[in-house]
Amino acid sequence: MDPNCSCPTGGSCSCAGSCTCKACRCTSCKKSCCSCCPAGCARCAQGCICKGASDKCSCCA
């Protein structure tokens, strides 16, 4: 898999634990910061899932 986890929205990918996943929007990747999180979000962590609009994020809501 691409180390940058560039995958389509709603798709699935297998990110490595060291992957930053900044461009990943797939539903299966929950290893790192969501692309929808604002810059400097202190709560970007595992389990973060983007929902809908770019400002709707489960870890930064």
From Swiss-Prot:
Gene Ontology cellular component annotations, sorted alphabetically: cytoplasm; nucleus
Protein residues bound to a divalent metal cation 1: C5, C7, C21, C24
Domain of life: Eukaryota
GO biological process: cellular response to cadmium ion; cellular response to copper ion; cellular response to zinc ion; detoxification of copper ion; intracellular zinc ion homeostasis; negative regulation of growth
Binding-site list for a divalent metal cation 6: C37, C41, C44, C60
Keywords: Acetylation, Metal-binding, Metal-thiolate cluster, Phosphoprotein
Binding site for a divalent metal cation 2: C7, C13, C15, C26
UniProt-annotated stretches for the region Alpha: 30-61
Phosphoserine PTM positions: S58
Protein's UniProt name: Metallothionein-1A
Organism: Sus scrofa
Name of the gene this protein is made from: MT1A
